């Protein structure tokens, strides 16, 4: 019963869309109405408000970290509990019950989850994102590369033997890549927006 309650709680935590909440609190347009229409930090940055983008990034990462940390802190379900909380909070961000199941792509939330699973895993994955983003200026490309490397880092650190958390990390990576399928098409067509590019007028 504890595992079930923790999983549901993790999903509800994940369902809080900071992109929408922060934008509303700061009097900005709903991020689902412009740019990529994705309620995430990168799209909020297209509004031109860096503070809102940073708050969105921190909030989305924090909720991922919090959901997993709470399960680990109270020892709920061991590694299975951690794996379920990780998947649940991630799915909450992707399909938030509070916002008609229209959520973001999960990059910041996944980063928070990985930091809670193990700081080295989270930092290695975040560093991968930063390196790709710095050199290529594409948030989506950085996310895709980080998603590919996250399971590899996890296996390198912890191995694969009877490790439900490794499967959770792999599942998040697959989901994150799938959520970026439109970005993949734009990258291949040379039409993807670069980091910091503002929303188009009337978009």
UniProtKB/Swiss-Prot annotation:
Reactions that this protein is recorded to catalyse: an acyl phosphate + sn-glycerol 3-phosphate = a 1-acyl-sn-glycero-3-phosphate + phosphate
Organism: Burkholderia pseudomallei (strain 1710b)
One Gene Ontology term from the biological process aspect of the record: phospholipid biosynthetic process
Record's function text: Catalyzes the transfer of an acyl group from acyl-phosphate (acyl-PO(4)) to glycerol-3-phosphate (G3P) to form lysophosphatidic acid (LPA). This enzyme utilizes acyl-phosphate as fatty acyl donor, but not acyl-CoA or acyl-ACP.
Assigned protein family: Belongs to the PlsY family.
Single annotated GO MF: acyl-phosphate glycerol-3-phosphate acyltransferase activity
The protein, known as: Glycerol-3-phosphate acyltransferase
Classification of source organism: Bacteria, Pseudomonadati, Pseudomonadota, Betaproteobacteria, Burkholderiales
InterPro entries: G3P_acylTferase_PlsY
Transmembrane region(s): 3-23, 51-71, 74-94, 116-136, 140-160, 164-178
UniProt feature coiled coil, ranges: none
Gene that produces this protein: plsY
């Amino acid at each position: 019963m504890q595992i079930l309650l923790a999983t549901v709680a993790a999903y509800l935590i994940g369902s809080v869309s900071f992109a929408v909440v922060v934008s509303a609190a700061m009097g900005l347009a709903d991020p689902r109405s412009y740019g990529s229409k994705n309620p995430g930090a990168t799209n909020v940055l297209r509004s031109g408000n860096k503070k809102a983008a940073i708050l969105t990034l921190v909030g989305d990462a924090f909720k991922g970290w919090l959901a997993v940390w709470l399960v680990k802190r109270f020892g709920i379900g061991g590694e299975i509990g951690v794996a379920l909380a990780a998947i649940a909070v991630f799915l909450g961000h992707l399909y938030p019950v509070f916002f008609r199941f229209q959520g973001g792509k999960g990059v910041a939330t996944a980063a928070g989850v990985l930091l809670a699973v193990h700081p080295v895993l989270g930092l290695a994955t975040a560093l991968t994102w930063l390196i790709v983003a710095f050199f290529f200026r594409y948030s989506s490309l950085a996310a895709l590369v980080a998603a590919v490397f996250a399971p590899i880092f996890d296996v390198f650190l912890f191995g694969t033997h009877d490790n439900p958390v490794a499967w959770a990390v792999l599942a998040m990576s697959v989901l994150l890549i799938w959520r970026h399928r439109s970005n993949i098409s734009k990258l291949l067509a040379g039409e993807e927006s670069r980091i910091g590019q503002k929303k188009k007028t009337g978009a």
